[in-house]
Every structure is written in C-alpha cells, then in structure tokens.
Amino acid sequence: MDYSDAPQVLRDFLIYHETICGHSKATVDQYYLDLRMFLRFLKLDRGLAPRTAELDEISIADVDISFLHAVTLTEVYSFLAYLSRDRVRQPNAHEPEYGLSASSRARKIAAIRSFFKYLTVKAKLLEENPVQDLDKSEAKAVLGRQ
C-alpha cells in the first residue's frame, strides 16, 4: 500500500508497528486506512476541508503534531457516532446501507488508541493521550448504540 499521502508521524507509527511490533503488512495497512479515515474526519469536522468534500478525497499530508495535540475525546466520540450512523458500508451498493459493524468500529478504536499511545509513550511527541480515558466499557457502550 502506498503511504505517500500520510504525514511523516503516521508513516513512523506504521513502520514502528511493522518492524518493532512485528505486525503483518495487512494489519499495518488496515491501521493506515483506519487512521486516514479518522484524520480525514477530523479535518472535515474542524472546517479544514470544504463541507462539500467527499471524505475519501481529503488529503491528510498536512496533518502535524499541533493538529494531533488538539484532538479531544469528544472528537473521537463524534467519529464513532459517524461510523455508527453515517458511514456507508458498501459505497458501490445499489442501495447504500449506513453504519459500520461493531467489529469494524472496534478495530478503528484500537488503531486510534494505539496511535496515540505511540505518540505519547514511544515517540514522546505528545505529553497527554487524548484517548487515555476512553476505557473499554465506554467504547463498548458507544459501539453498542445504534
């Protein structure tokens, strides 16, 4: 998979997972796709991309540490709500269905959690982890809502 549109900090995270953590290329690619979607959502939600922009067309190349430093738990909850209610399951389907499965949403939460843990604990680029207080019971409660 081509990570050329990913900011350096995300590429560093992906390399860390593949080389140090020993995750498969498929797992690392999935982390990239999940985090790319999250960052695109944040740019749209913060008004940093035109409201008319398709989520899949928003560039994340300009995402930097200051952008990530501003991430809040509330934004993560908004992203989870988007996944649960508004994200199209199969974009090419004749009649689109909305809302990703609980397992897809859980995987995205795991990717976000891992990314911010990396930024705070391993890379030491952030002092505080904005998703640290997103405990598993909270995530299950959010994921269970439809």
What are these regions (language model features)?
Residues D2-S4, L143-R145:
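A short, ordered amphipathic alpha-helix with a cationic face
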Residues Y3-L10, V28:
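Onset of an N-terminal alpha helix
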Residues R11-A26, R36-G144:
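N-terminal core-binding DNA-recognition domain of tyrosine recombinases/integrases
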Residues M1-D2, L68:
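An acidic intrinsically disordered interaction segment
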